[in-house]
């Protein structure tokens, strides 16, 4: 089916379902937002509405940092030859905060040719005595940040660059977020928000950076946290502040060291920081600052050493990204489970690619025969078992098709420490695909499940992880995107934390499979992989996806389409409802590795049509452990 037509059908299906669930007015409102965003450009400001900001200001009238009820946040900012217009905009964004719980700590290392930096700061100090300043020798950004910290009196610290802009509600929202965490009994030691890029006017941002909740594997591949990060001052001092030897990636290094102590982080999905894009800024890419990559690899290598893990840190697929090649513990055996009904030509393509390309040699393949009718299929099985050492065919004794039951049956014949669910209509592309899947799981602290990059034959993406809530239930990250792209915030080009991955290629520790009792056989065809991953996640295990294990997926040739068959359509609807019944509709629609400012209508990480959560300024913060 044509990709555009397929997208249109998916969108129409979601509109129909949304109308049923929430009514026509809601569907029309979201549809209007989608059309406005899609066809009339991105004019979203990401700011709360005027009345929301006015209400915050009114709440704080007559209050000071000491009696406003919010924790004080000291913002650390090194200054160096800052252009006057940028500096004024930055200082103005602090002065015009809706709450008084901020302190701005400035360490100025500007040279003698730029006396206007101090002059401008002194001017703004008359407007707000919460701005503190000291002149320092230029010892680099980390050392200068540490110098700014000596001025801090707040319980919390934040980091801001001298040429950026704070959202007007940044201090208010972060202060409220800390209180909310305390009310919930969750850790309040490290928080971060979303951000946006801009060039001249924050009311006309280029793009929003809408981040997932804390994602440890993603953080090892790039500093997705960036701004605005807030953390306890006592913890910063305990760690000795920022490390000058990591200048260029000092914040990434700091965040890794903080999380080693906190065990996680809290995410507030509000745009609280505007990152200016100009020549020389890291927001424009590390091409402007080549030393960043070396500093980042040092930060990551040191992090592995401190946490007792072994692996090699390499450059990633794109600048600003990195790859950890984990050392695999032992020589684990992998049992590859492949359900099959007829289509011997597809199966042969799959098996041949496994044996001809796979570099990891400790594996077995179990083909699970289910209700084939073509005599040639059974002749093929006998021939294949002779040609492929380590292949065995087992026969599922039931009738019909039940993906879950078939794989549960196949697991009984498996002897490996790891199980790999694999469709019969996939073809291996790179030799270390299985090694890479094992790298993500078979090391101390590794994930329980790892999924692969799957391509359609036309070189577009079929699977780069699963996001729950897309289309109302679940969808594939970056589906239909052209191969070779980085995706949204590098999310199609770096190892990622996800709530689920597709069962078309899914590696799982056998012990974890057994712990959750395998696949739920009430999900005969759809959502069995999503349900399985969610049950594993709920046990406290991690699910990741890697772009370095690549296969081509000739999707669902064996089963054919379900769209026009009323029996299959009814079964699909029942499985959709069961997904809600088992896991809760609210949780399905609130994937922690997605973001409420991103659309549920498409699989491309585009912005939501209405951005209600931003306009209403809702403070909903969530802590997530490593």
How should these model regions be labeled?
Residues 136-152, 396-414:
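Glycine-rich, basic loop-to-helix element that forms the pyrophosphate-binding segment
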Residues 269-286, 316-322, 521, 541, ...:
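Active-site donor/metal-binding and catalytic loop motifs
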Residues 154-165, 416-429:
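Short beta-strand-to-loop acidic/aromatic patch adjacent to the donor-nucleotide binding site
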Residues 169-206, 426-473:
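Conserved donor NDP-sugar-binding/catalytic core segment of glycosyltransferases
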Residues 92-101, 352-362:
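Short, acidic, metal-binding catalytic loop of nucleotide-sugar glycosyltransferases
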Residues 2, 6-68, 289-331, 458, ...:
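C-terminal, non-catalytic tails of nucleotide-sugar-dependent glycosyltransferases
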Residues 31, 35-288, 302:
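Nucleotide-sugar donor-binding/catalytic module of glycosyltransferases
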Residues 235, 245-271, 300, 433-438, ...:
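A short, conserved alpha-helix in the catalytic core of glycosyltransferases
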């Amino acid at each position: 089916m044509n990709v555009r037509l397929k997208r249109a059908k998916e969108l129409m299906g979601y509109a129909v379902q949304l109308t049923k669930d929430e009514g026509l007015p809601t569907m029309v409102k979201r549809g209007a937002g989608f059309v406005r965003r899609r066809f009339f450009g991105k004019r979203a400001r990401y700011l709360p509405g005027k009345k929301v900001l006015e209400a915050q200001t009114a709440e704080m009238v007559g209050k000071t940092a000491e009696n406003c009820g919010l924790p004080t946040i000291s913002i650390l900012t090194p200054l160096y030859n800052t252009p006057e217009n940028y500096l004024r905009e930055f200082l103005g964004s602090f002065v015009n905060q809706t709450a008084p719980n901020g302190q701005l700590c400035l360490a100025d290392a500007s040279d003698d040719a730029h006396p206007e930096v101090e002059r401008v700061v002194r001017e703004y100090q008359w407007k707000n005595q919460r701005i503190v300043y000291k002149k320092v020798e230029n010892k680099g950004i980390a050392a200068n940040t540490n110098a700014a910290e000596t001025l801090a009196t707040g319980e919390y610290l934040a980091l801001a660059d001298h040429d950026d802009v704070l959202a007007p509600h940044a201090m208010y929202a972060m202060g409220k977020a800390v209180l909310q965490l305390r009310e919930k009994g969750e850790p309040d030691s490290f928080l971060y928000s979303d951000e946006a890029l801009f060039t001249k006017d924050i009311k006309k941002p280029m793009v929003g950076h809408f981040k997932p909740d804390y994602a440890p594997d993603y953080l090892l591949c790039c500093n997705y946290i960036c701004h605005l990060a807030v953390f306890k001052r006592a913890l910063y001092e305990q760690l000795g502040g920022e490390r000058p030897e990591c200048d260029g990636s000092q914040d990434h290094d700091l965040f890794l060291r903080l999380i080693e102590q906190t065990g996680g982080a809290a995410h507030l999905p509000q745009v609280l920081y505007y990152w200016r894009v100009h020549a020389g800024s890291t927001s424009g890419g590390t091409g402007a600052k080549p030393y960043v990559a070396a500093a980042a690899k040092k930060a990551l290598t040191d992090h592995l050493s401190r946490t007792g893990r072994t692996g090699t840190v390499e450059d990633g697929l794109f600048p600003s990204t990195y790859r950890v090649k984990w050392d695999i513990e032992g020589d684990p055996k992998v049992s590859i489970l492949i359900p099959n009904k007829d289509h011997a030509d597809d199966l042969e393509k799959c098996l041949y690619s496994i044996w001809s390309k796979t570099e990891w040699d400790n594996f077995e393949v179990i083909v699970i025969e289910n209700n084939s009718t073509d005599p040639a299929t059974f002749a093929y099985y006998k021939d294949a078992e002779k040609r492929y050492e380590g292949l065995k065919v087992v026969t599922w004794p039931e009738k019909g098709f039940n993906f879950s039951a078939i794989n549960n049956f196949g697991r009984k014949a498996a002897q490996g420490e790891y199980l790999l669910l694999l469709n019969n209509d996939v073809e291996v592309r790179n030799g270390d695909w299985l090694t890479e899947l094992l790298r993500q799981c078979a090391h101390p602290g590794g994930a329980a499940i790892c999924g692969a990059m799957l391509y359609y034959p036309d070189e577009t993406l079929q699977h780069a992880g699963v996001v729950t809530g897309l289309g109302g239930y679940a969808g594939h990250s970056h589906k239909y995107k052209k191969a070779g792209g980085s995706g949204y915030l590098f999310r199609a080009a770096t190892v990622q934390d996800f709530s689920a991955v597709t069962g078309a290629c899914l590696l799982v520790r056998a012990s974890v499979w057994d712990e959750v009792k395998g696949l739920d056989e009430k999900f005969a065809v759809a959502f069995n992989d999503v349900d399985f991953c969610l049950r594993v996640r709920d046990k406290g295990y991690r699910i990741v996806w890697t772009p370095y294990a690549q296969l081509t997926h000739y999707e669902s040739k064996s089963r054919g389409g379900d769209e026009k068959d009323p029996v299959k359509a009814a079964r699909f609807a029942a499985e959709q409802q069961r997904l809600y019944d088992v896991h809760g509709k609210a949780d399905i629609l609130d994937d922690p590795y997605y973001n409420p400012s991103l659309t549920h209508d498409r699989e491309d990480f585009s912005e939501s049509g209405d951005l209600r959560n931003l306009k209403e300024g809702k403070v909903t913060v969530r802590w997530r452990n490593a």
